[in-house]
């Protein structure tokens, strides 16, 4: 990976002149079945941009109560985008895994075009896998069900897919399964610096028009950088060499959970470890 970074062709990405960054953005967009992509310095920035593209100031974003967008992004969606958030319980039903999306619960909360009486719901954010849920995976059919309901209501979807790579590996589809997940959302963020092992960066994907808007917003937030090809090269290398290795991470996480449970019964449920978080 470091050799790829050192040898990467670079240019000025603010002017769209970095060939390695462009190649990464195009590749991730194609994998997720979207028109265009945008490299960002962090997953939080990718989420802020993705949500802001879908939610105008004063409109509402729905998400679960332990979602990264509402718990770990320092209030950025409200402070920087004027976005109102409303949440459903992360364990949406008794006994349900924390972070597992329940389309019935989400649909009951949506209030699109609410007029002068309630805040209008503009978008729903879902997270797959779910960080604070310990790597909970929402199965693809559930996301597809949610997508049908939100589409019928005229509500957009942002997918925080920081660990989406882990979800598709756990499902057994690998990179080939990404497009089906991408089709469940209007904007998707994926992280290169978690399980994939790149040093920096996330990619936001969406329509070409939305990504052009995001490029402007990224600069406004201080995320426009110059010779980003040295970072993008790491992402490209990770996509070529590290995705399949996530299965090994998952195996080790299960082994760690089993060992912890054996040493101190009740401290962790090994059956709940489906990806790489214990």
Regions found by a protein language model. Name each.
Residues 1-8, 13-278:
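Conserved PLP-enzyme active-site core in the AAT-like
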